[in-house]
């Protein structure tokens, strides 16, 4: 399984929305990217504000069946982490399930969505959108009310906006996804689990998490299992968390 088409868009409302609109045009796996996204959407309905050329927005569309499609965001976080290490030498941490942090601030957001397509919408696919903050100034995060956000430039990385977006998009395509999708499609998250755990900032920390009934639980995050669930040790036993918001003590102002 490999990405057979990459489309560059000078500007679009949202790469995820564009991919959904054009999903039937793509082959089994395709990607779209832009530096100018004007109507993005974050995880849990949060907005992702356009950075006017100072960020990279990249979406991969997959029609092929996956062993564990719900864990694609975790694979994506590893793919981005590797590319940022290669380009800038930074060591990002992953806040479960897929936020990438640098020095405790959010650098990358990832949003995956399921897609129905084809005759009577019987086809099933998945897309994964990635937003990487490259060179926004502090004033951008202040104006957007994103006190816990940051960019590579703010963290001291030497960002070249003329070349870096295309380099990162190519790297995500060739090395982030192409080299891993076959294994992921066949075996799911398990082959990537140890690498993910080594980068996961949740582990060993106190967390609070949403329960299915709308209440909250709390405990120590002790593992990420083979299905990508966060394992939390609570006073009443272990909880395996897969959906909802998880707050980590000491991160994003959580206490």
Feature names for model-found ranges:
Residues 1-90, 106-108, 115-116, 254-255:
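N-terminal lobe of the biotin/lipoate ligase/transferase fold
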Residues 65-67, 74-92, 102-255:
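Long, positively charged amphipathic alpha-helical accessory segments at protein N-termini or as interdomain linkers
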């Amino acid at each position: 399984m490999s990405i057979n088409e990459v489309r560059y868009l000078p500007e679009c409302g949202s790469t995820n929305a564009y991919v959904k609109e054009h999903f039937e045009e793509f082959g089994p796996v395709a990607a779209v990217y832009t530096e100018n996204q004007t109507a993005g959407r974050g995880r849990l309905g949060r907005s992702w504000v356009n950075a006017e050329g100072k960020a990279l927005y990249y979406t991969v569309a997959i029609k092929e069946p996956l062993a564990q499609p719900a864990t694609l965001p975790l694979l994506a976080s590893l793919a981005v982490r590797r590319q940022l290490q290669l380009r800038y030498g930074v060591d990002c941490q992953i806040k479960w399930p897929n936020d990438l942090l640098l020095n405790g601030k959010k650098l990358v957001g990832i949003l995956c969505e399921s897609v129905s397509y084809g005759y009577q919408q019987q086809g099933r696919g998945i897309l994964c959108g990635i937003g990487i903050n490259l060179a926004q100034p502090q004033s951008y995060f202040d104006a957007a009310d994103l006190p816990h956000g940051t960019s590579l430039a703010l963290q001291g990385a030497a960002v070249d906006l003329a070349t870096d977006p295309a380099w990162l998009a190519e790297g995500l395509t060739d090395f982030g996804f192409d080299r891993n999708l076959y294994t992921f499609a066949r075996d799911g998250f398990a082959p990537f689990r140890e690498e993910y755990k080594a980068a996961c900032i949740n582990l060993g920390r106190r967390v609070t998490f949403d329960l299915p009934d709308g209440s909250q639980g709390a405990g120590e995050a002790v593992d990420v299992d083979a299905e990508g669930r966060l394992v939390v040790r609570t006073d009443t036993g272990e909880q395996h968390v897969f959906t909802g918001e998880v707050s980590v003590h000491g991160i994003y102002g959580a206490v």
